Amino acid sequence: MNASNPCRRFPRSARVRTRAQYTIVFDTARRTSDPLLSLHWRTGDTPPRLGMAVSRKVDTRAVGRNRIKRVLRDAMRHLLPELAGGDYVIVARSAAAKATNPQIRDAFVRLLRRAGALPLPAAPGTMPPARTVRPSSPSPTEPEL
């Protein structure tokens, strides 16, 4: 569990924590949404920080709300090194209560890509970048043109 290994915990510096910070994000941020989640983001020069809002309207049981937050924190922890700087607040929607953990994680990654916070994945089946081939020296048997 994360409590036994402090290196695996989600650091305080990577969280939106106070009401004032949430208010700034909600008032000045751009928004994009998915059937499961809504993302409010504000770009900046600061390291990326995550805030979550999972209300009782989403799931009346604390177990369900905590599961959603746990999945989002874990996904954010893995994406933190490649994430653009700024504040990101995720608002869970009621459909998230019935979604599986991979569905929630995929929706989160999809929203971050749509926001431009993550690089787009390479399209499957695309060719790798072309290598530059240096012209070889002419062979002594072939005539030069």
UniProtKB/Swiss-Prot annotation:
Q: Which UniProt keywords apply?
A: Endonuclease, Hydrolase, Nuclease, RNA-binding, tRNA processing
> Which InterPro entries does this entry report, sorted A to Z?
Ribosomal_Su5_D2-typ_SF, Ribsml_uS5_D2-typ_fold_subgr, RNase_P, RNase_P_CS
Instruction: Give the Pfam families listed for this entry.
Output: Ribonuclease_P
The entry sums up its family as follows: Belongs to the RnpA family.
Under HAMAP family, the record lists: RNase_P (MF_00227)
Q: How does it assemble?
A: Consists of a catalytic RNA component (M1 or rnpB) and a protein subunit.
User: Which Gene Ontology cellular-component terms appear in the entry?
Assistant: ribonuclease P complex
- The name on file for this protein is Ribonuclease P protein component
Q: Name one GO molecular function term.
A: 3'-tRNA processing endoribonuclease activity
Entry's EC annotation = 3.1.26.5
According to the record, the residues making up region (Disordered) are 119-145
